Amino acid sequence: MKNMKLKVLLALCALLLLSAFIAERKDPITIFMIGDSTMANKSLKNGNIERGWGQMFPGYFTEEVVVDNHAMNGRSSLSFINEGRWDVVLSKIHKGDYVFIQFGHNDEKPRATLHTEPGSTFDDNLRRFVNETRA
């Protein structure tokens, strides 16, 4: 029992010592949001009550986290890439930031500018977002 208490005490001291060497991030963490209308910011004009969940998301954080919502109505993973929207987001990402991805509703539409195939091009686009974010 004494041996276990000593081990726990040593572990806590080691954690305390290590935490002194962890560099604090000076900039806030940014959560980038990419997706379709389900996530997008909506106009508040003319009594519109519709909101994308990404529009409400910043209210759950302190000033240490910035939410940068790039989701747009009517976009698929394909159109988001082809319109250059992904390149804009990618150019802003720094180590320690996050990217939340929410596509699918428009990827299933038959229009060539939107359509992707599950298990093929849709998956490829999602992998691209993840791999390029990690790079």
Could you describe each region identified by the protein language model?
Residues 2-3, 25-26, 85-135:
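Alpha-helical cap/lid subdomain in secreted, periplasmic
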Residues 43-47, 79-82, 112-117:
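Short, solvent-exposed loop/turn segments at secondary-structure boundaries
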